[in-house]
Amino acid sequence: TPIKSSAASDVYKRQIIKNPEIDIVVEMLGGIEPATSFMVQAMKAGKHVVSANKAAIAANYGLLTETARENGVRFLFEASVAGGIPVLTSITGALQSNNFIEIMGILNGTTNYILTKMTEESLSYEEVLKDAQDKGFAEADPTADVEGIDAANKLSILMALAFDKYVAPEDIPTKGISKITDRDISSAALQNKVIKLIGTARMEDGKLQYLSLIHISEPTR
């Protein structure tokens, strides 16, 4: 349950921040605040922090990573992007000697599920969204997913790690899938293509040349 009241905040500080037996704090609140403030407090208290909160991390990447560095603690957020795929660890670990020039991928499972069902079963956006919500794949309020906000958060984190350049999620040109119709799906199919929501960014000559979260028609296989 998100901690919002001042009383709950006091409990957090007393039972967690000031507890010398706690070395690692796992943030599971969701949202930007109070999650960001609580993570910063934990770091300043000398505690390592683990989080999958892509919204807070993308919005305050510099603050969180710098606070961790200044206080000699670790800030781990692998699960914030791509779930069980260790993409962030790969970037900062096994592949860190590489020069990354481009990021491109489907960054949100909910939108991919919706577009796939619309394509393969000739269903409307509204029908598939309701199906996804009934199955627990989509939230009751799906805005963050279907309008590309979730994917923009993930792209922001990926760029920060791969390119060492931070771009705030709100500065990433973003287009969701809520306006995609069965006519759009059919038009793509006539060209032997499918519609996907792709997050992409590219570095050229040390400059971020292109970044977006847009619809791309991909050839079917």
What is each of the regions a protein language model found here?
Residues 6-45:
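N-terminal glycine-/serine-/threonine-rich beta1-alpha1-beta2 phosphate-ribose binding loop
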Residues 30-32, 55, 80, 108, ...:
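Short glycine-rich anion-binding loops that position phosphate/pyrophosphate groups of nucleotides
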Residues 35-36, 54-78, 88-91:
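Rossmann-fold NAD(P)-binding glycine/threonine-rich loop
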Residues 128-213, 217:
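Substrate-binding/catalytic subdomain of NAD(P)-dependent oxidoreductase enzymes
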